[in-house]
Amino acid sequence: MTRLFKALLFSLLLALGVAGCGSVTVSAYQDQKPALDLRTYFNGTIDAWGMFQGRDGEVARRFKVVMDAKWTGDTGVLDEAFEWNDGTTSRRVWTLKRQPDGSYRGTADDVVGEAIGEVAGNAFHWRYVMALPVDGKVYHVDFDDWMFLMDDRVMLNRAAMSKWGVHLGDITLSFTKR
């Protein structure tokens, strides 16, 4: 390896490391109100409206979701029925489990492994890999998902999608509890 290449590689790795250190953690929202309790908010029927924007910001798809959610102890089932702007429908059923340390783990049929999340203040942050079908192929895409409770009925959600560290787009949702 040449010295120039080594220097460039070191600079790139250093820049990536510094960028990773600047990430916001959920604890930054510890004092924000109203305090979010997933078991309280995700209980009953919730309506949501959302959109997917590609990395250029253009809205590529819009959707409505009706979620039926219920908890038994520390285990919650969130049954989501999607209606997309092209008339297609889909369904995702999440199973969430509150852990002894207060964190959450979640599974769904199209989630690879487990989603892992934490709550602090009015915020819920979780990460997971989703198997997304696109044009007959399935891609494993990373989700960095943030939810913020605005009041007892409204929650806002933004998820950044990436593959191999490359930003693919964002999903934005507004939840309204009935």
PLM regions and their residue ranges:
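N-terminal helix-cap/turn-to-beta initiation motif at the start of protein domains
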Residues: 29-45
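Amphipathic hydrophobic-ligand
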Residues: 59-65, 138-143, 167-169
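Bacterial N-terminal signal peptides that target proteins for export
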Residues: 1-9
